[in-house]
């Protein structure tokens, strides 16, 4: 995971929350598709105006209020004219300053979003934050242990609870998924035990997908040998799989 802070002239303006056009704090989800390129983007806006841009759940960019506002406007596909008007009103800067920084930000966002885009450290001149140098307003990812049951009996298992430990019902898990979204958590990983033993797993994946969350699965992969079952998970919206043996 790369943690960066956008570095351009706009960050030299006042590092304060804009006085006008105040988007509500929350988590916003966007999809980028261009030919064979596909990316999922999350922008988390904090109450103090700062933001966090997360690309494909594996690149994290910390944004000050000015950069967060501009990123929000760009991702919301506001026109150049609208963006210039809003930013000028919020920060009392010239049209030329906004236009210059908008062009820089557009280029940076385009490269960050593309799977084969420029390296954010060596090619985009982004500043690096040291790990754990800042406390995020919410986790970037939440792992949910759906069950502690397993269809293996490994001597090296790290499962901390008894296999008979009760699980929650599907509607209870959906409430938890909704709460994680409301908290600003964009990435969910279903784990266990063996999560594929829970027949409602595809339903939970689909629910998280409808929220806008990226979903992953930690599994021993035994049930994934069933192509019909695997297709069901993919159709529900599963994004990635980690096989643990």
Where are these regions (language model features)?
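Conserved alpha-helical substructure of the radical SAM core
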Residues: 100, 104, 108, 123-240
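Acidic, low-complexity/disordered tracts enriched in E/D and polar residues
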Residues: 1-72
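Short linear motifs at secondary-structure transitions and domain/linker junctions
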Residues: 17-20, 27-31, 35-39, 46-48, ...
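Conserved phosphate-donor/acceptor-positioning beta-strand/loop module used by diverse small-molecule
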Residues: 243
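A generic short-segment signal for beta-strand/edge and adjacent turn/coil regions
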Residues: 21-25, 30-31, 38-42, 109-115, ...
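Long, charge-rich, low-complexity alpha-helical segments
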Residues: 2-14, 59-143
